[in-house]
Amino acid sequence: MKKIEAIIKPFKLDEVKEALHEIGLQGITVTEAKGFGRQKGHTELYRGAEYVVDFLPKVKIELVIEDALVERAIEAIQQAAQTGRIGDGKIFVYAIEEAIRIRTGERGGDAI
C-alpha cells in the first residue's frame, strides 16, 4: 500500500477529484493548507499599505491505495492539476505498513 499526498491549487480540486473518480478511486481526504515554494509569495495593497503575503492558499489531497494503482493515480493527479505555471504543486508517495478500518477491524487492502 502507498499513501499519495498531493499539494495543489485550490481551484483544481474538482478536476483532480473527478480524474481520480474516473480511474476508480473514491476515498480521499482533503485539507486546506497554506505554503510556498519557488514562487515565494506576492505583495498586496490593503488600506494604502503594502503587505507581503508569504503563504499562498493550497489544498492537500491524501489517499491510500494499493501499489498497482499508484502510477495511474499519479498520472491522473498530475494531468488534472497542471496549469503549466509556477505553483502547480507537488506529489509525494509514501509506503504504508498497515491500514485498519476502525469500524470492522479489517486490515490491509480490505481496510482501504
UniProtKB/Swiss-Prot annotation:
GO terms for molecular function: ATP binding; enzyme regulator activity. Belongs to the P(II) protein family. This is Nitrogen regulatory protein P-II. Coiled coil: none annotated. GO terms for biological process: nitrogen fixation; regulation of nitrogen utilization. InterPro entries: N-reg_PII (IPR002187), N-reg_PII-like_a/b (IPR011322), N-reg_PII/ATP_PRibTrfase_C (IPR015867), N-reg_PII_CS (IPR017918), N-reg_PII_urydylation_site (IPR002332). P-II indirectly controls the transcription of the glutamine synthetase gene (glnA). P-II prevents NR-II-catalyzed conversion of NR-I to NR-I-phosphate, the transcriptional activator of glnA. When P-II is uridylylated to P-II-UMP, these events are reversed. When the ratio of Gln to 2-ketoglutarate decreases, P-II is uridylylated to P-II-UMP, which causes the deadenylation of glutamine synthetase, so activating the enzyme. SMART domains: P-II. The modification O-UMP-tyrosine is found at residue 51. Keywords: Nitrogen fixation, Nucleotide-binding, Phosphoprotein, Transcription, Transcription regulation. It comes from the Bacteria. GO terms for cellular component: cytosol. It comes from Rhodospirillum rubrum (strain ATCC 11170 / ATH 1.1.1 / DSM 467 / LMG 4362 / NCIMB 8255 / S1). Homotrimer.
